[in-house]
Swiss-Prot record:
Disulfide bonds: none annotated. One of the proteins required for the normal export of preproteins out of the cell cytoplasm. It is a molecular chaperone that binds to a subset of precursor proteins, maintaining them in a translocation-competent state. It also specifically binds to its receptor SecA. This is Protein-export protein SecB. Coiled coil: none annotated. Belongs to the SecB family. It comes from the Bacteria. The lineage of its organism: Bacteria, Pseudomonadati, Pseudomonadota, Betaproteobacteria, Nitrosomonadales. The keyword Electron transport does not apply. Keywords: Chaperone, Cytoplasm, Protein transport, Translocation, Transport.
Length: 157
């Protein structure tokens, strides 16, 4: 009886966060200290990407990379990039669900850490904090799947 329960538990879907960490972090202020006396409001641009890798059976790494560039005219005020990563355990889940978990659920867990890291680094560098809006990773995932389907459709003709 106990063996049957143990076997049934082993077949239950499992999801867990093993670790969340900063994989890479960089800050550049190429025009310091002169840039600190500029009075113009900077233009801020944000780039976002994510990547996944299977580390071993049932263990995955997901990395969300956020790059924030602040410019006044053609001069870079600062550039900060963080690669926020997480290691996740995903077991006994169908592959199509694993893809959604890795592309939506895991980035949703990791992104707030990246947002906090960027705000903290920018503030420590002497600038007002950059407050990143939440990201709809579900919409990004759907868009990525549509683009892949179009690319696959274009190459099969």
């Amino acid at each position: 009886m106990a063996e049957e329960q143990a076997a049934a538990q082993e077949q239950q879907p499992a999801f867990g966060i093993e670790k969340v960490y900063v994989k890479d972090l960089s800050l550049e202020i190429p025009h310091a200290p002169q840039i600190f006396i500029q009075r113009e409001a900077p233009q801020v641009s944000i780039e976002l990407s994510n990547a996944t890798a299977q580390l071993e059976e049932g263990i995955y790494e997901v990395v969300v990379t956020v790059t924030v560039t602040s410019k006044i005219a053609d001069k870079t005020v600062f550039l900060v990039e963080v690669a926020q990563a997480g290691i996740f355990q995903i077991r006994n889940v169908p592959q199509e669900n694993i893809d959604i978990i890795l592309g939506v659920t895991c980035p949703n867990i990791i992104f707030p850490y990246a947002r906090e890291t960027i705000s903290d680094v920018v503030t420590r560098a002497g600038f007002p904090p950059v407050l990143l809006n939440p990201v709809n990773f579900e919409a990004l995932y759907a868009q990525q799947k549509q683009e892949q389907a179009k690319a696959n459709g274009a190459t099969t003709h």
